[in-house]
Amino acid sequence: MLRKAKKTMVRTVFLRIGIGLVVLLLPLGYRCVAEDNGAISRGYEAVTTDFGNFYLDRGNLTKLGIGVGVAAVFANTEMDQYIRDKYQNSTRSHVTDQATNIFNISGTELALIAVPVYVGTYGAGLWLHNPTMVEWARKSVRATVVGGPALVFLAVATGGDRPTDGDSHWNPFQNTHGVSGHTYIGAVPFITAAKMSGKTYQKAIFYGLSTFPGLARINDDEHYFSQVALGWFLAYLSCAVVEKGTDRQEGRVHVQLAPVPKGLAITVQKRY
């Protein structure tokens, strides 16, 4: 059963990564080969930059370590169990069940919903010449992809159980529920929107919405608080490194040489 759960989780993450890379590498139009090659080059550069900023940057690794440490305190003491019992016995009701119904699907199903949404938004943005839609879709996919390996590793390495299966204490490599993948996948699009928003109230709304998938898991007794919190924090860090990579790329002058019919083309692009 454990082996099957691990295979399912790994398969889901690799599905997201594979389709995500396809989206990232989609050429921005078909007007010339040089433009297509430029899109592929930018997509590859964005992915490698994101992974470097997440897994090699000391500042990000420090933040991740702090997040894991805080989650460990909640998970390996009675704090997680107290929060779970308090909520289930005193707060959960028919009203909260109805309110969280929209998120009452598995992480795998949520991933399979998110991918077409991102692809559809990306395509619609290109068709409508709406750069905001394109940017949101690409950043959301990049964030989902970059944090995927960390999510899988931590979920398995911590070995946490669901509330209905056991206590919150970590049992390394004994289970796959130490981090809420549902929370992670569900939070990314809202955190991305928050980071793209220019007004404080808009940021507050989107950040608030980003917590709903995790709260639904707590309400449905599918995850402990620490598992949800760590899933959300991973989503936040993933979105932050994507934003960091985008900021670093702005202002660069890109010069590219590409073959075209009857010769070569040189393209020069500066981002603002």
What label would you give each PLM region?
Residues V70-Q81:
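Alpha-helical transmembrane segments of multi-pass membrane proteins
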Residues A75, G123-A124:
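Juxtamembrane "helix exit" motif at the C-terminal ends of alpha-helical transmembrane segments
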Residues L64-A72, Y118-T121:
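Short, glycine/alanine-rich hydrophobic alpha-helices that insert into or span membranes
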Residues V95-V117:
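Interfacial helix-start motif at the membrane-water boundary
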Residues Y82-T91, A99, G166-Q174:
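Flexible, solvent-exposed loop segments that connect beta-strands
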